[in-house]
């Protein structure tokens, strides 16, 4: 049974709010509005009737003057469970050793071992349990107490380790402790991500776990018309997930602002820097009050990411799962074959025959360039394989369609550049590296 040989994939038949931590948010909002400095951030994205043709350059506020005029906000919500308090240092060290966990910093909370120990409000726990999760991942066990404590933190862990929930759930708790948004307010939680696909995946998690609290979110990324995104921002969203370039566009034309941001997440910071987003990240972060809580997540820990953390995080605590260097996942069996360019096609087809013996398999083929991506897809389709391509030159509608076809198994082979495939967030049985990349990532 296989994609090209049987039934489903026969090539001959294939057509080319509520709960704890909230307090009285209505009265808090009135207090916030009275105390707010109306001049703050005026040149950093205030919604003041600008047109699309008149973007204004973002200018960093004078925080020494502005910060004393801003209302204080709550960010420490962690209450250590009695069962966690009772664990000895030996037990904690053994737990961290089992999870290949390294911590850096002072006064770091002990890890939890169950969802109940995290101390989340009932409305969060109900959402988690409804998803059928049995226990937290390693990064969540340590990351949740760190994030809920209100400290700036760094999490270094591989993609797929559960890091999205590590910052998403504490972010929901953070939002519900703040005053309600008023008309014209920007988000409370801002998540920066390197790619459209990852941003959309993060939005799905935020929507899923924020629904019971009626928390609104907006996903802002390039490659699509701005109209729908502007409408979402104008209606108000407690969470904004954004790629850096499009967010700056929205700030410069005055369609949102960062006055209310008190919880900032930099997801896949290493990849954002690899893609050249450092100037945009710095421009954005400079617009946010410096006493915010900042959470930085990265798969690796190169010097460029360290410098960014040094510049924008205040006395951070760090958790790292596994080695600081990139290494092969223990959950993946790898086979390396060195062949000539002439042999690549036939060898790929041979492996596809084997991989497709399970008709439910999903196969991801990596190519180093957009051109190679299209070429590989073309000859696979010519040979009868149901393959589709995804890369940065595809418009967002086509990218979404390709991902949906792949996710639902109608096109179980996807050929992608590594950047486009980042953050796909779905189970894949087989990966084929058609080209060797020239970066360690």
From Swiss-Prot:
One of its GO terms (molecular function) is ATP binding. Its main location: cytoplasm. A motif (DEAD box) lies at residues 267-270. Residues 347-441 form the Helicase C-terminal domain. Residues 144-319 form the Helicase ATP-binding domain. InterPro entries: DEAD/DEAH_box_helicase_dom (IPR011545), Helicase_ATP-bd (IPR014001), Helicase_C-like (IPR001650), P-loop_NTPase (IPR027417), RNA-helicase_DEAD-box_CS (IPR000629), RNA_helicase_DEAD_Q_motif (IPR014014). The Q motif is unique to and characteristic of the DEAD box family of RNA helicases and controls ATP binding and hydrolysis. This is ATP-dependent RNA helicase DBP2. It comes from Vanderwaltozyma polyspora (strain ATCC 22028 / DSM 70294 / BCRC 21397 / CBS 2163 / NBRC 10782 / NRRL Y-8283 / UCD 57-17) (Kluyveromyces polysporus). The gene is DBP2.
